[in-house]
Amino acid sequence: MLIIFISFFDRLLLILLIASKMTNTLASITYEDDITIITLDDGKVNAFSYEMLTQVHRLLDQVPQKSGALIIKGRNGIFSGGFDLKTLASGDLSKITKMIESGYNLILKLYSFDRPIIAAVSGHAIALGLFVACCSDYRIAIDGKYICHANEVRNNMAITDQIMEILKERVNKKYFYSAIYHADPFSVKDAIDVGYIDEVISEDRFMERVNEKAKELASLPHPFYANTKKIAQKERRKKISVSIKKYQIQTSILRAILKLKFW
C-alpha cells in the first residue's frame, strides 16, 4: 500500500513539475537546418519582464555564432509590448533596475550579434519590442492593423542613450521628430518609410518569406560578416556599453542610499 502511495505521489510531483515548467516558458528555441528560431510567447503581450529577458539571454547563448542565421518572432498579433509595465509600476527599485539593465544588455547583444538576425514582426511592436526589432539585420512585418510605436515620450519617459544609439542608425531623419520626439505610432506599412520595417507580407506568406530571407542571410560567410559589422559599429557599441556601465553605477549608488537609515 505504501509503495502504491509513493508511486502515485511521484507521478503527481512529476506532473506538477512539468506543468510548472510549461507555465514558466516565456521564450523557446528551435532549429531548422542552419536557421535558429527564438519565439517570444508569454500568452499575453510578450512583455519583457526580467524573467523573459533572462530566458532570451540564455537562448541567445545557444545560437551558433559561426554559421547560419537567427529568426526572432512573437506570437500571433504581437511581437512585443516592451518592458513589463507591472514591474515598472511596482515601486520595487531592485526589480525595476534589474529588468531595465537586462533589457539594455539584450539590445547590445542583439545589435552586435555575430550572425544575421531577422525579426519576424508578427503584430504590434511597441517600445522595447520595437527596439529589439531595430537591432535586427532585416525586419519583416505581417500585414494587418498593427503598429510600430516608440511611445516613451507619451508615457512620461525619455528614451535613454542605450536605445537612442540604435534609433539614430535606424530611423529615417525625415521622420525622427514625429517618430521619436513626438512618439507618433505608425502602421506597419508606414513604418517602412520611417525605417522601422523593411517589408510587410501577407499572413499566408509571412513565415515563408521570413524563412526565405533567413536562408539568404545565413549564407554570409564567417568571420567576414561579423568583422565587417564590428568595424562599422565600433563607436556605437562603445557608446552603448559606456551608457550601460553608467546606469549600473547610478542605480547601485541609488540602492545604497535608499538602504541607509536616517535617525
Predicted regions and their residues:
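Conserved CoA-thioester-binding segment of acyl-CoA-metabolizing enzymes
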Residues: 5-73
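Glycine- (often His-adjacent) and acidic-residue-rich active-site loop
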Residues: 54, 66, 74-105
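Catalytic-core regions built around general acid/base machinery
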Residues: 59-62, 102-113
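Structural motif
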Residues: 73, 120-121
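CoA-thioester-processing core
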Residues: 126-179, 209
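C-terminal long alpha-helix characteristic of the crotonase
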Residues: 141-142, 194-243
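Acidic, divalent-metal-coordinating active-site segment for phosphoryl/phosphodiester hydrolysis
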Residues: 183-190
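Intrinsically disordered, low-complexity segments enriched in small/flexible residues
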Residues: 231, 235-263
